[in-house]
């Protein structure tokens, strides 16, 4: 029976590996005095170079599934006092400390204040000394509606801000009118009279500018 012919480059089923003859392999031209190193000599088939030998401390067990360059060296053995038995959960040489319990932050109790006083404390009410109060009360007897410039001067004299003086006079007027209801009616009448007078003066000024005559009521 004639054996089937094998052609290089066309593998057949159940065919042995094809080995190329030596004279088929390309060799570059060399001078007659050139000597090829023994590691580069071409044989009838390509040989896989062997990996270099590792030192004794780094030798590893061969693993057929992991290449030699992927294997990690084993860690050095621990001293006798630090070795742990596989059956014991904790080595007697180690001392395990329990976790410290969580402690809630200490919150200092606030003074118990109820009613309107609690609201005033929450808003940050300004507290005046007796000297400051006497200065403000003296000015309040002269004028219950100080101007912006007067409030600034009072603020400098009692060492507070201008808006604090404005709030103090607002609260002081409310308390004064609550204690003297008849004064509130007078204040409203004066405000209405002042508005009417200012309107009449404005009309007189406009009439004088245009040359018309305006009769005062």
Swiss-Prot record:
User: What tissue specificity does the UniProt entry give?
Assistant: Specifically expressed in early embryos.
Give any GO molecular function from the UniProt entry: DNA binding
- Pfam annotation, one family: Homeodomain
Q: Which UniProt keywords apply?
A: Developmental protein, DNA-binding, Homeobox, Nucleus, Transcription, Transcription regulation
Where is the stretch described as Disordered?
Answer: 190-217
Which family, according to the similarity comment?
Belongs to the paired homeobox family. Obox subfamily.
Checking PANTHER family in the record gives: E5-RELATED (PTHR24339:SF28), HOMEOBOX PROTEIN EMX-RELATED (PTHR24339)
> By what name is this protein known?
Oocyte-specific homeobox protein 8
**Encoding gene per record:** Obox8
